[in-house]
């Protein structure tokens, strides 16, 4: 190597001058960089991230905690990148100052040192190019591995989609079975309600019939009391008539004796006249006394004429009373006959009513038997209905939880998509900025490598750092590969378990189909029974009310499920926290393995339980209705466990989309069913209207009959009261007549005694033949006017009436006897 002078001219060699690679000026044009290094993109990204951070710190930003933590990590990483960028800018400025100083020194360095430096820089470039190529190859291998993993993930997604579709089909079948059971139970409940209504109506009719019976009994008791009173009064009147007859007979005998005495007196008078005629000579002295007696006789004749007039008036009164008595007897007999006819008609009506009551009692007994049988069936059905309602509530709870979970996941997905788009934009902008920066840095680096030797030491240090970084990456990749292998093993185990569970589900589906057929047969039998009951009982009035009540209950249940949605959200947040802890802690994977082993042990226990349940189902097939609820409950638990496993193992977007589709289909299905229920409701309303009109017509007919019967009873009661009043008035009249007759008889007895005294006082000669004839005529007339024909007619009428009443009472007793037995 030639020694050159240390002058500035000696440093300059025209052959070695490279203006393209080395700068001859003292300026920093080649080593200057932009002060921001993509500051516009970074500033925009930072502004967006600061907005996101503020929204995360606030309460109005609704997002899942996973997304929040993810965005917070991104903000922290971007802040670190910004700090690194600033540090790199500062370091680049320091290096630019050093490079400018080195450029100045290089101008004063000889050419030999310049060549050596250029060779070193060229070797360093080659080494850097080789290392860069190796790093690119490693990056390509890593990208290939990432693609392979993405393909595996897509395959797993497809498997999960298939499993989700199968699960949706199973859920649809389960919903159909539950809906069929609900329909049958609703029909049974409607039938029970209708039976209860009919039973209440029958009880009401029974009460009305009992009230009518009580009214009839009261009327019969009143009639019997009136009969007893009438018979007592009749007996009293008969006794009085007998007494009057006896008194009349006694009076006749007395008059007969009096007639005999009068004849004796007449004979004595004749004898006295004979004696008077024979002794007229001797009685001349007594002529004055005879004249006095004649005057007394004239006075007595006047008195006798007055008595005769009084007797004639009394005879007229007696004839008037006899005619009135005959008229009253005829009217009373006619009224009695009318009352007897009415009583006979009432007895016939009562007999008809009793026969109708017997028929109704027989019908009631048959209906009670049927009602008891239906009650037993309804109790069994009610127990099953309670079990099914509990299971249905649990299923609705799970469905609402899923809906809430899906809605929350939809919101999370939207926020994630927005965040993912923002992050993609940030990534693109940062890549573009860093690409530009890398290009500028590479160009400047090449120039700087040509200019400085200190970078070799930095390159050596970076190689060491790079080797250390490669070792770390290799270790991390090995760990990731081990984790992937563990995950694949778990996936394989899960696939095997899913296959086993598919077999079990198919077995359960087969059992459910058999149960469905048996339920259909039971339903047909029950429908036949219901048709018979409906033909006898009649109406479906309460179906609309029951449906309205069921809709209200469903609305209340939907309102009650809102707090359960909040509980489900809290559970979801807790699960997300658990997932964060699992992602953050690598050491927890061993615990996951333990938990997986525990879950496998639990699954085995569940499988053993399922096998035990199937054996119990085989034994207890006869008790289908009791086992339906248990089987559905077990099936529901198995499905729930499967869903939970799928949720734990597959936390990805495809399953959420599928579940959203399922929910939409289920809502459409519910809308269809609601429309069908509405159409059925219209039909049932029409049928119930027709049947209600028939019931109203029958009820009106029955009420008309009842009102007629009540009117007849009221008329009978009124006529009975009228007859009682008439009988009382007749008894009063008869008592008044008897009193008058007794007064007349006493007056006549007094008159006869007076006549007897007068006859004893008077002489027989003083009475003439004409007077005697008149007295005999009076006595004959008096004998004729002793009421013998009227009393005889009274006796006959009273005896006839008594016989008629006795016959009627006997016939009524005969008619009433079987009724009392019933």
From Swiss-Prot:
It comes from the Eukaryota. It comes from Mus musculus (Mouse). Keywords: Coiled coil. Residues 129-164, 223-397, 510-537 form a coiled coil. This is Coiled-coil domain-containing protein 175. InterPro entries: CCDC175 (IPR038834).
């Amino acid at each position: 190597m030639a020694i050159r002078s240390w002058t500035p001219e000696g440093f300059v060699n025209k052959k070695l001058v490279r203006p393209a690679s080395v700068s001859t000026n003292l300026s920093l044009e080649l080593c200057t960089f932009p002060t921001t290094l993509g500051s516009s993109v970074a500033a925009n990204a930072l502004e967006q991230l600061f907005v996101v951070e503020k929204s995360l710190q606030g309460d109005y930003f609704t997002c899942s905690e996973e997304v929040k933590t993810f965005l917070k990590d991104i903000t922290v990483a971007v802040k670190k990148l910004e700090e690194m960028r600033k540090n790199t800018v500062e370091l680049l400025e320091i290096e630019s100052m050093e490079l400018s100083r080195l450029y100045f020194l290089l101008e004063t360095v000889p050419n030999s040192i310049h060549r050596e430096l250029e060779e070193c820089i060229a070797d360093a470039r080659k080494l850097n190019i080789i290392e860069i190529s190796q790093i690119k190859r490693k990056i390509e291998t890593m990208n290939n591995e990432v693609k392979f993993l993405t393909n595996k993930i897509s395959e797993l997604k497809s498997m999960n989609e298939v499993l989700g579709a199968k699960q949706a089909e199973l859920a649809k079948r389960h919903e159909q079975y539950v809906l069929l059971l609900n329909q049958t139970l609703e029909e049974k409940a409607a039938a029970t309600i209708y039976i209860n209504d009919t039973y209440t109506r029958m009880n009401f009719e029974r009460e009305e019939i009992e009230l009518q019976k009580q009214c009839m009994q009261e009327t019969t008791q009143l009639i019997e009391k009136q009969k007893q009173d009438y018979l007592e009064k009749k007996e009293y009147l008969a006794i009085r008539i007998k007494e009057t007859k006896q008194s009349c007979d006694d009076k006749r005998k007395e008059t007969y004796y009096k007639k005999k005495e009068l004849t004796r007196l007449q004979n004595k008078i004749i004898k006295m006249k004979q004696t008077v005629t024979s002794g007229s000579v001797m009685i001349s002295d007594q002529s004055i006394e005879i004249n006095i007696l004649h005057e007394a006789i004239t006075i007595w004749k006047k008195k006798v004429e007055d008595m005769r007039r009084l007797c004639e008036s009394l005879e007229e009164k007696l004839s008037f009373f006899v005619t009135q008595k005959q008229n009253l007897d005829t009217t009373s007999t006619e009224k009695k006959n009318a009352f007897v006819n009415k009583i006979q008609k009432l007895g016939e009506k009562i007999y008809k009513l009793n026969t109708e009551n017997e028929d109704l009692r027989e019908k009631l007994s048959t209906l009670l038997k049927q009602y008891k049988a239906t009650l037993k069936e309804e109790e069994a059905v009610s127990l099953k209905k309670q079990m099914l309602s509990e299971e249905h509530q649990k299923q609705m709870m799970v469905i609402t939880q899923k809906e809430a979970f899906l809605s929350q996941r939809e919101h999370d997905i939207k926020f994630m998509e927005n965040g993912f788009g923002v992050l993609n934009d940030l990534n693109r902008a940062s890549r573009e900025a860093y690409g530009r920066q890398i290009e500028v840095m590479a160009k400047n680096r090449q120039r700087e490598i040509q200019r400085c030797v200190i970078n070799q030491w930095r390159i050596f240090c970076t190689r060491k750092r790079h080797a250390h970084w490669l070792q770390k990456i290799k270790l991390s990749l090995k760990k990731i590969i081990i984790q992937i292998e563990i995950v694949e093993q778990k996936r394989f185990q899960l696939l095997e378990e899913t296959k086993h569970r598919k077999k079990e589900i198919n077995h359960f589906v087969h059992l459910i189909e058999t149960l469905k057929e048996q339920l259909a047969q039971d339903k047909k039998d029950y429908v036949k029974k219901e048709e018979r009951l409906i033909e006898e009982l009649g109406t479906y009035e309460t179906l609309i009310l029951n449906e309205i009540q069921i809709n209200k209950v469903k609305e209340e249940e939907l309102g009650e499920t809102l707090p359960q949605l909040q509980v489900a959200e809290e559970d979801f947040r807790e699960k997300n926290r658990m997932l964060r802890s699992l992602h953050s802690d690598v050491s927890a994977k061993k615990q996951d393995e333990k938990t997986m082993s525990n879950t496998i042990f639990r699954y085995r226990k569940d499988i053993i339980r399922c096998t035990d349940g199937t054996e119990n189902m085989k034994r207890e097939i006869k008790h289908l209705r009791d086992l339906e609820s248990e089987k559905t409950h077990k099936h529901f638990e198995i499905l729930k466990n499967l869903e939970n496993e799928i949720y734990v193992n597959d936390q990805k977007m495809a399953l959420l989309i599928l579940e959203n589709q399922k929910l939409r289909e289920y809502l459409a299905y519910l809308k269809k069913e609601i429309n069908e229920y509405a159409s059925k409701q219209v039909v049932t309303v029409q049928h119930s209207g027709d049947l209600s009109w028939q019931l109203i017509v029958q009820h009106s007919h029955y009420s008309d009959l009842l009102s007629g019967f009540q009117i007849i009873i009221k008329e009978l009661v009124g006529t009975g009261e009228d007859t009682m009043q008439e009988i009382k008035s007749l008894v009063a009249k008869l008592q008044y007549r008897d009193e008058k007759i007794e007064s007349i008889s006493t007056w006549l007895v007094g008159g006869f005694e007076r006549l007897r005294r007068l006859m004893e006082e008077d002489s027989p000669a003083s009475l003439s033949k004409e007077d005697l004839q008149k007295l005999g005529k009076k006595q004959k007339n008096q004998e004729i006017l002793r009421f013998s024909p009227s009393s005889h007619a009274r006796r006959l009428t009273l005896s006839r009436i008594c016989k008629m009443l006795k016959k009627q009472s006997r016939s009524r007793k005969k008619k009433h006897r079987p009724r009392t037995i019933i």
